[in-house]
């Protein structure tokens, strides 16, 4: 068996692993980095990977930190916000709608994962990162100062890769987490099926009501949103991808799964025909390109960062829920923490304290994000509950976590120590409100539709908090954070 030595080994060459390799190389171009990837490049376009939509943190990370702004604008789609529809019968324009009439300041994107990962592959190989394609990681051994990854190829060629840093980006496979026995369940139970069709589904075509089209600017571009078709215990996503392909998913609580069968695409289409007939009709005879199902998709991890030369990023560590598209946010945040730890270690610093603090921060972010979903799916068909929930969840996300990320404060331990008390206070406010939403969700209310359009652009606090993210990172963050938290407290009453 051959042995190869490097500074860093990253297990997994998907979005999380490629971004981490690039970020580490940007910080230290002399780092010898190896990425172990079981599949090969180039990826096919519109590859079957969930995680096709970004929100503000993930979009900023890809655009600015990864330097992909031009690529995102040229090869992917500018997202027209998150949009929720309530009801299923009659004209689409007669349903109730929560969403923006125009884009907010900070761009977000609908991304083709194959296209994006191919670009990142080129970027990191140009920077000198070695990507071992067609190489499956069979086992990980943590051995003090030098760790080992034992790999195999389709040709049965075994190799041991050694490095002082093993960084796991293996996604739901969770290689390092399983090695350590750090799997951990949580209190949120969610299930999903998703598939792609070889057809651009433009949700605007579901209504011919010109007055409805005129509500948004630009007109007839609602299809660029992450469109959510809402119901008691479930939501259906309709996400456009590049090159006239559409991703469709159904995300549901256990009660919906028990009431309906989703084991096959035929069962899924039958369910759509009853519960979201407009969506089923739009799919029509389009070719189903794939079909994926997963039960109990949400999970935790006992620890994701260590001073002993290992860490996990993205879904290799934790996963909350797809509703607000937070996957690329968690990649951005975990990669930022990992890059800081590797950089400090390279400089000869003791990183024990920093690793422990980053773990605490990250676990707090995870818990707050998880609270947005736990025991709340029953209320997803309730327009009144969701209008209040989206207002709070957006302000909480933009006003606190997004501000800290955009200002570069999450790895500033002295700042986070100063900010800890107000953050704890607003987290308690969030927990109180989420508990109220959970109580409302138990009723599984479906209200009669009234053709209401709740325009998020008409809510001044949303525009204000999103606009603040455009300010430069050197603007005093603690002052703005305290102002934002005071504003959120007033909203919560």
List where the protein language model places each region:
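Redox-cofactor binding/interface segments in oxidoreductases and associated redox assembly factors
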Residues: 11, 168, 312
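Glycine-rich FAD pyrophosphate-binding loop
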Residues: 25-50
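N-terminal FAD cofactor-binding segment of flavoenzymes
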Residues: 43-89
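FAD/FMN-dependent oxidoreductases across multiple families
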Residues: 232-234, 240-242, 256-380
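Predominantly flavin-linked oxidoreductase catalytic cores and closely associated redox partners
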Residues: 123-278, 335
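Beta1/beta-strand and adjacent pyrophosphate-binding region of the FAD-binding site
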Residues: 2-16, 34
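C-terminal helical "tail/cap" subdomain of flavin- and related membrane-associated enzymes
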Residues: 341-493
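Short beta-strand to alpha-helix junction loop
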Residues: 101-122, 257-263
């Amino acid at each position: 068996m051959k042995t190869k030595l490097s500074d860093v080994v990253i297990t997994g060459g998907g979005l999380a692993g490629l971004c981490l390799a690039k970020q580490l190389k940007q910080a230290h171009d002399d780092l010898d980095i190896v990425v172990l990837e079981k599949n090969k490049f180039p990826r096919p376009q519109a590859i079957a990977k969930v995680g096709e939509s970004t929100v503000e943190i993930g979009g900023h990370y890809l655009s600015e930190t990864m330097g992909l702004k031009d690529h995102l604008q040229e090869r992917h789609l500018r997202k027209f916000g998150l949009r929720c529809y309530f009801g299923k019968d009659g004209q689409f324009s007669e349903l109730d709608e929560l969403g923006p009439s125009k884009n907010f300041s900070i761009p977000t994107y609908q991304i083709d994962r194959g296209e994006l990962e191919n670009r990142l592959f080129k970027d990191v190989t140009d920077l000198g990162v070695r990507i071992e394609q067609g190489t499956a990681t069979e086992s990980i051994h943590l051995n003090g100062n030098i760790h080992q990854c034992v790999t195999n190829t389709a040709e049965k060629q075994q190799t041991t890769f050694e490095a002082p840093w093993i960084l796991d980006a293996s996604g739901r496979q969770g290689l390092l987490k399983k090695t350590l026995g750090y799997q951990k369940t949580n209190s949120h139970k969610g299930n999903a099926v998703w598939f792609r069709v070889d057809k651009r589904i433009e949700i605007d075509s579901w209504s011919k009501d010109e007055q409805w089209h005129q509500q948004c600017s630009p007109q007839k571009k609602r299809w660029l949103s992450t469109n959510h078709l809402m119901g008691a215990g479930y939501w259906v996503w309709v996400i456009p991808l590049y090159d006239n392909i559409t991703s469709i998913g159904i995300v549901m609580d256990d009660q919906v799964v028990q009431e309906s069968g989703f084991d096959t695409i035929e069962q899924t289409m039958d369910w759509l025909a009853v519960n979201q007939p407009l969506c089923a009709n739009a799919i029509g005879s389009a070719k189903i390109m794939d079909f994926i199902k997963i039960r109990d998709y949400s999970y935790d991890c006992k620890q994701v960062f260590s001073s002993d030369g290992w860490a996990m990023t993205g879904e290799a560590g934790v996963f909350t829920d797809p509703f607000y598209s937070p996957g690329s946010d968690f990649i951005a945040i975990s990669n930022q923490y990992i890059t800081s730890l590797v950089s400090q270690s390279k400089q000869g610093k003791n990183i024990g304290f920093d690793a422990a603090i980053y773990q605490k921060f990250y676990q707090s972010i995870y818990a707050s994000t998880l609270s947005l979903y736990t025991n709340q799916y029953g209320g997803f068909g309730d327009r009144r509950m969701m209008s209040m929930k989206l207002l709070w969840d957006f302000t909480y996300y933009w006003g606190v976590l997004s501000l800290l990320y955009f200002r570069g404060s999450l790895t500033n331990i002295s700042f986070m120590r100063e900010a800890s008390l107000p953050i704890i206070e607003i987290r308690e406010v969030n927990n109180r409100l989420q508990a109220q939403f959970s109580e409302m969700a138990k009723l599984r209310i479906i209200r009669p539709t009234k053709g209401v359009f709740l325009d998020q652009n008409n809510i001044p606090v949303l525009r204000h908090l999103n606009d603040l993210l455009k300010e430069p990172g050197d603007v005093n963050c603690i002052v703005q954070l305290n102002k934002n938290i005071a504003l959120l407290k007033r909203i919560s009453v």
